[in-house]
Amino acid sequence: MNDEPLAQIEREVLGWDGVFKKRDEDGPGGIGVTGYRYGDAETGGPQIGHIHDDGHADFRFPREVRDELIRSGRAIPHPAFPNSRTTASYRIRSADDVPGALELFRMNYERRKERNGPTAKVG
């Protein structure tokens, strides 16, 4: 897979106030995972989504939102946990997939920002 779509998503998401990343080199199945969180990098914060190195992105949403995203074709059930009530997934294979992934990240970002309040940009 071309890494540019993942880099493009990272540049955009890290440009949002209060978003930082946390890298896990030994994610599920031995695949590296980059999680994007909202809050303070020192104390942590809720994840707005994560991307596996193979381009598989996962997001947790309220059940109603997750179900609507899947019904509308904007997301798919999680491949390993298809019966999860809150986890939606999205495949990033090319630059054409970037807008859809950013939409899901932005939805969770806005939800977290509303719930947790504004935060200063973390460097």
Predicted regions mapped to residue ranges:
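Charge-dense, helix-prone N-terminal extensions
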Residues: 1-123
